[in-house]
């Protein structure tokens, strides 16, 4: 009989899975992106996408989606298939770093708060590596931010991420004024116990 500890988080591509599935240099680079906001190299993104796809397929996933929270108050998803036809009549499973990092849904059906004209319908979903991907049913759900072509926030997550970046920047400035030069990043957290995590 399976215990709760056996299946708790088993469908989440969390730190334990990343550490097990990714080469050490890829894992270290991704952790630097997550913890310090460092830019993500295209080769690292491809390696992460391959590991994420293989893990998802092992758990029965056939599709992936960029999962985001537009201004409608509910979540939205754009589903794509891992499956591509092969020349010999079979199928191959594909998922690239480019597909992981960015999607381009039609933004015309989502509210914009008057930020742009209706004909400026292009919107982008951008992978948020600070939130773990997870499997729901047969779909790998990739948490993303949703922005307009010119960078305006079209969702509820982008303002939160930008606020966290601003808080990190100012908190680091204050800490360095007090002589603490070792802190690289400040992570605000909200929960039963509110605290701020410092990355040294």
Walk through the language-model features, giving the residues of each.
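Buried hydrophobic positions in well-ordered alpha/beta secondary-structure cores of metabolic enzymes
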Residues: 64, 192-193
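Charge-rich interaction surfaces and accessory domains that mediate macromolecular binding and assembly
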Residues: 115-182
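Flexible, glycine/charged-enriched surface loops at secondary-structure junctions
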Residues: 41-43, 179-189
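Conserved structured core elements
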Residues: 46, 58, 161, 165-169, ...
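Conserved small/polar residues in nucleotide/adenosyl-binding loops
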Residues: 196-199
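Histidine/acidic residue-rich metal-binding segments in metalloenzymes
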Residues: 4, 8-11, 16-97, 102-117
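Structural beta-strand/beta-sheet cores of well-ordered domains, especially the beta-sheet scaffolds
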Residues: 36-38, 90-91, 125, 138-144, ...
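Divalent-metal coordination cores built from histidine and acidic residues
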Residues: 1-5, 193
């Amino acid at each position: 009989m399976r215990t709760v500890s056996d299946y708790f988080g088993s469908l989440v591509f969390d730190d334990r899975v990343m550490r097990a599935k990714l080469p050490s240099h890829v894992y270290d680079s991704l952790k630097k992106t997550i913890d310090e906001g460092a830019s993500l190299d295209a080769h690292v993104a491809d390696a992460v996408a391959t590991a994420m796809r293989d893990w998802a397929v092992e758990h029965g996933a056939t599709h992936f989606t960029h999962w985001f929270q537009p201004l409608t108050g509910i979540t939205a998803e754009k589903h794509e298939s891992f499956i591509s036809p092969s020349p010999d009549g079979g199928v191959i499973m594909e998922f690239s770093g480019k597909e992981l990092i960015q999607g381009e849904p039609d933004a015309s059906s989502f509210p914009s708060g008057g930020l742009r004209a209706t004909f400026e319908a292009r919107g982008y979903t951008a992978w948020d590596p600070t939130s773990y991907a997870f499997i729901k049913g047969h779909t790998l759900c990739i948490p993303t931010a949703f922005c307009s072509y010119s960078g305006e926030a079209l969702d509820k997550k982008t303002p939160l991420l930008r606020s966290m970046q601003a808080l990190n920047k100012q908190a680091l400035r204050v800490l360095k004024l007090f002589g603490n030069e070792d802190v690289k990043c400040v992570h605000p957290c909200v929960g039963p116990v509110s605290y701020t995590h410092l990355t040294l």
